[in-house]
């Protein structure tokens, strides 16, 4: 059982490592070659915040323009979004404004968004500086982390920090937690240790 269920969506261009981040978080493993995500795929895991069991239900979306309308339908009913770019591909960073505009147009206004610069293990091929990522996040009111789905660096933190922010908003009364359109569902008021459950399907990590 869980105290709360939080729904997440992972967004960003094709090939930035969205599916790899999900797999690393739910299964603690890295799969370098995936088929492209077609539409939307799913994973879930339990975490603990403030001694409360929280289930994260995570939707991994396709980055291709042809699937954008499907992705948009998943913004509604999401409490958190991971907006991902690839630090070795500047075009994926340049497209963030478009992704963010979509998120803020179609999601509820209280959705927590974290900006993730993925593939931090590929420092020698870096095309976007840490400072640029931080500046974009600061200017747009986002949480910011650089991650590596390959080494697992900051992957746990990305998902958990987002959940902590959502939980903080619940404590402040920013959400009507009885309205599931905010991406939050009440469970049983019990506490639980960290664990894992459903495995995600593969997809969409690499071009």
From Swiss-Prot:
Q: How does it sit in the membrane?
A: Lipid-anchor
One GO cellular component term of this record is: contractile vacuolar membrane
| Cell compartment(s), UniProt | Cell membrane
Residues recorded as binding GTP, renumbered to this chain, are 12-20, 60-64, 118-121, 148-150
Q: How is its activity regulated?
A: Regulated by guanine nucleotide exchange factors (GEFs) which promote the exchange of bound GDP for free GTP, GTPase activating proteins (GAPs) which increase the GTP hydrolysis activity, and GDP dissociation inhibitors which inhibit the dissociation of the nucleotide from the GTPase.
* Lipid attachment in record (S-geranylgeranyl cysteine): 205-206
For the region Disordered, give the residue spans: 187-207
Where is the motif (Effector region)? 34-42
The UniProt entry, under SMART domains, shows: RAB, RAN, RAS, RHO
Chemical reaction(s) catalysed: GTP + H2O = GDP + phosphate + H(+)
Where is this protein chiefly located?
membrane
Extract the PANTHER family matched here: DRAB11-RELATED
Function description = The small GTPases Rab are key regulators of intracellular membrane trafficking, from the formation of transport vesicles to their fusion with membranes. Rabs cycle between active GTP-bound and inactive GDP-bound states. In their active state, drive transport of vesicular carriers from donor organelles to acceptor organelles to regulate the membrane traffic that maintains organelle identity and morphology.
Q: Which family does it belong to?
A: Belongs to the small GTPase superfamily. Rab family.
> Know the name of this protein?
Ras-related protein Rab-2A
Q: Name the source organism.
A: Dictyostelium discoideum
- Lineage, broadest ranks: Eukaryota, Amoebozoa, Evosea, Eumycetozoa, Dictyostelia
Q: Which gene encodes it?
A: rab2A
